[in-house]
Structures are given as C-alpha cells and as structure tokens.
A protein has these predicted regions:
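A feature for the membrane-embedded catalytic helix bundles of lipid/isoprenoid biosynthetic enzymes
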Residues: 1-18, 87-132
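Single, functionally critical "micro-switch" positions that shape active/binding sites
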Residues: 26, 64, 84
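Helix-loop junctions at the membrane-solvent interface of multi-pass transporters
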Residues: 25, 45-49, 75, 102, ...
Length: 132
C-alpha cells in the first residue's frame, strides 16, 4: 500500500544514481553480490543485540538493492542478473529472522515459520519464471 508512494519519492534518486554508476561501467550483478555481503552482516549484529547497527545494515542493503536494479535498467537487464538479484534478496531476507532467532532463541519457532513463508514465496516466484 505504501510502496507506490515511496517509489514515487525514491525512484528518481535511484535512477539518477543508477545512471551515474552505469556510465562508470559498474556492474548490477556486482551490486547484487555486494548487497548480499553487506546484508549477511545483519546476522551477528542481531544475534549480539546490536539492533541499531542491524537497522543501518538493513537500510544499506535496501539501498544497494535499489541501485542494482537502477544500474541494470540503464545497462540492460539479463536473465542471469534477474536470477542473481532475487537469489541475493531472498538470502538476505532469510538472514534477518535467523539473526533474531539467535538473539532470542525463544523466537526460533516464529523465525522458522517466517523462513518457511520466504521459501514458499521464492518457490512461487521462481516457479512462475519457469512457466513464462
């Protein structure tokens, strides 16, 4: 519901940054992998109770994820790039409940249920891509 409103505000800036990065021959795939690398640091941060730093990492991951798409739109998308992007995103999404489960083991069941919903979402998304 908020996504269209936020995208209207965020997308122009991401598009300008993506164009600038694309002109400097930056790789959208490299940004996808870098976003995952940054994002995975959320696991120990959450486990150690560093929620302030974890929030910054999550926001940085989302920024990098927005930039990889903007770069791809300027340089041209590829099937592999789309696959890599969604795989890196799903791996990052899984990292967040894992970190919370490590921080509060009593929440492990809820984290597992959330992870199961991510698996179903990813399977549905990738299964639909096979049919397309």
């Amino acid at each position: 519901m908020l996504d269209p409103l936020l995208r209207r505000w965020i997308d122009p800036s991401l598009d300008r940054a993506g164009a600038w990065l694309a002109r400097r021959d930056m790789s959208a795939n490299a940004f996808s992998v870098a976003g995952l690398a940054v994002g995975l640091t959320v696991i120990p941060l959450l486990a150690w109770g560093r929620y302030d730093m974890a929030l910054l990492v999550i926001l940085l991951n989302r920024l990098i994820d927005g930039l990889d798409g903007a770069i791809a739109r300027h340089k041209g998308t590829t099937p592999f790039g789309g696959y890599l992007d969604i795989m890196c995103d799903m791996a990052f999404y899984a990292a967040v409940p894992i970190g919370f489960a490590l921080a509060q083991p009593g929440n492990a069941l809820w984290a597992a249920l959330l992870l199961a919903s991510f698996v179903c979402t990813a399977s549905s998304f990738l299964g639909r891509a096979v049919l397309a």
